[in-house]
Amino acid sequence: MLKLENISLKIAANPLFSKLNLEVDAGQVTTVMGPSGCGKSSLLAHLCGTLPSVFQTSGKIILHARTLNNLAPHERKLGILFQDDLLFPHLSVGENLAFALPAKIKQQERRAKVEQALEEIELSGMCERDPASLSGGQRARVALMRTLLAQPEALLLDEPFSKLDQELRGRFRKLVFAHAVKNQLPTLLVTHDPADARAAGGDILSL
């Protein structure tokens, strides 16, 4: 379970939103909605431990009984998908995926896991491809699998569907939510689009 207790973000002593309390169970997708500038992305940055120091914060972030507030970003075991896929342009598709794998996984197993991930998203045979040669929908799928290969314990979604066209958006949404359920990941989606919130099927909170 991902649990937020009395989370508050302020900048220059001005609160971005009222104190936030929520619980997200394993395999559940909870949506946080609100207009641009209300603090949705800042909330996710705070959860990840990457919020700029200009913000003042309070409250507790708890994941599976671990308090995350004082942990470094890489110790929090949170996966995040952004609006942009953020694939490394100097690495192949396969190398992008392998980058996320824990160091304890060695060469042959790494290759097998990368190929399995590509097969799972219907991109078999694209291991050596340049990410720039992929379509937007293909890049989005690779970004999702890279996030999951890092073995996160919760998933954060920062409007990852917003730059896709309507057809791709619906298909990618289904894929992301299906993997959240399959991997039993507490998932927090921030969006301004009611269609995303409806598709998530979980609780909806407005900032």
Identify the residue ranges that each predicted region occupies.
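ABC ATPase NBD coupling module
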Residues: 66-82, 103
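ABC-type ATPase nucleotide-binding domains, specifically the catalytic core motifs of the NBD
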Residues: 52, 72, 91-111, 120
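Conserved ABC ATPase signature
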Residues: 130-134, 138
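Hydrophobic anchor residue at the start of the ABC signature
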Residues: 144
